[in-house]
Amino acid sequence: LADDMPATMADQEVYRPEPEQIDSRNKYFSPRL
């Protein structure tokens, strides 16, 4: 089970969310642009 989900820092770095998710996050974290 743990293999599928990123457990170590390296795994998290390698794993990158989809561009749409990144865009959504940027908009959410930077409301005033």
From Swiss-Prot:
It holds the Pfam family PBAN. Keywords: Amidation, Hormone, Neuropeptide, Secreted. Involved in the control of pheromone production in females. One of its GO terms (biological process) is pheromone biosynthetic process. Residues 13-26 have a biased composition (Basic and acidic residues). Its main location: secreted. The keyword Phosphoprotein does not apply. InterPro entries: PBAN, Pyrokinin_CS. Residues 1-33 are annotated as: Disordered. GO terms for molecular function: neuropeptide hormone activity. The modification Leucine amide is found at residue 33. Transmembrane segments: none annotated. It is found in: Secreted. GO terms for cellular component: extracellular region. This is Pheromone biosynthesis-activating neuropeptide. PROSITE patterns: PYROKININ (PS00539). It comes from Lymantria dispar (Gypsy moth). Belongs to the pyrokinin family. The keyword Signal does not apply.
